[in-house]
């Protein structure tokens, strides 16, 4: 029977390590890292990714991707998957979808987001939710197990920028979907 576990908490709360510890003595684990190093990425993020890589057991498989996770799960048969994390996957999908919507590669995505109307925002949110639904469906179809790490969001002030508000709301929608399915 397929199993989905959701681990949530604040930024830097240790949730990734908790998830890794759950599978520490397991073999056949595939770690799906949703933050991928890009050419223009800042050194702080590169260091964070490096630390995460170093923490993983040597016999785990690492798959760095945030797109087509459901297809990857359907095409493979690992005993367990650890997806770290849904928030980064959402962020990456969001910026890809905005750039695609405005044919703006690499472009100025910040300006594009400021121009977005309600229908465009809802369209992107729907697409992102569909991606996560496909991941859950792929687990059910293959009877596999996955733990997903995600950030708790929305407990503080209302973000000042439109971009931050859209992302906060999108993270919340993703977390609702995953919580219902886990």
Regions found by a protein language model. Name each.
Residues 77-80, 142-147:
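Loop/turn-to-beta-strand initiation segments
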Residues 80-106:
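Conserved, surface-exposed functional patches that form binding/active-site neighborhoods
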Residues 2-75:
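Conserved P-loop
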Residues 90, 155-162:
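Short, solvent-exposed loop/turn segments at secondary-structure junctions
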Residues 151:
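Acidic, metal-coordinating catalytic segment for phosphate/diphosphate chemistry
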Residues 130-143, 174-177, 181:
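Catalytic-core regions built around general acid/base machinery
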Residues 98-124:
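A solvent-exposed, charged loop/short amphipathic helix patch at secondary-structure junctions
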Residues 161-182:
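Phosphate-binding/switch region of NTP-binding enzymes
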């Amino acid at each position: 029977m397929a199993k989905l576990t959701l681990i949530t908490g604040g930024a830097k709360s240790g949730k990734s390590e908790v998830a890794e510890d759950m599978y520490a003595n397991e073999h056949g684990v595939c770690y799906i890292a949703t933050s991928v190093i890009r050419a223009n990425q800042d050194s702080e993020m590169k260091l964070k990714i490096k630390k995460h890589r170093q923490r993983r057991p040597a016999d785990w498989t690492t798959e760095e991707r945030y797109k087509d996770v459901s297809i990857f799960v359907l095409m493979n048969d690992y005993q367990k998957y650890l997806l770290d994390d849904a928030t980064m996957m959402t962020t990456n999908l969001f910026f890809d979808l905005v750039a695609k919507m405005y044919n703006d590669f690499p472009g100025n995505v910040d300006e594009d987001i400021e121009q977005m109307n309600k229908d465009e925002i809802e369209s992107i949110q729907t697409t992102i939710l569909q991606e996560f639904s496909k991941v859950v469906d792929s687990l059910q179809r293959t009877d596999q197990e996955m733990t997903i790490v995600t950030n708790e969001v929305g407990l503080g002030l209302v973000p000042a920028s439109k971009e931050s508000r859209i992302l906060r709301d999108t993270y919340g929608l993703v977390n609702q979907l995953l919580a219902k399915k886990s």
